[in-house]
């Protein structure tokens, strides 16, 4: 049985990694060893930050809701509790959008929440 060298397999594997490393600075897009390390690190960052993005957006929504709620004389937590007691199920993403783009509608929700808290 003749000896089979892995040249084609290795070249394919290297090409695949170097293709993923396109656009990286310096040797990180030229040399396989440093490109491979950087691609692995980049994939880890991408995986981590897909989860981080969800947390970041939730924090942003809460900040926007809180700012508008305080203009209506409520804290964020009291507003959310008031809405829950009133049976209004609006998620934070929609509330934040209302707080930025439709202040009148947000103010209506805030007055409803305030009245349910006082009642």
Curated annotation (Swiss-Prot):
Record field: transmembrane: none
Superkingdom as given in the UniProt entry: Bacteria
One Pfam family this sequence matches: Ribosomal_L20
Entry GO CC: ribonucleoprotein complex; ribosome
Protein name from the UniProt record: Large ribosomal subunit protein bL20
GO molecular function (one): rRNA binding
A GO BP entry: ribosomal large subunit assembly
Gene encoding the protein: rplT
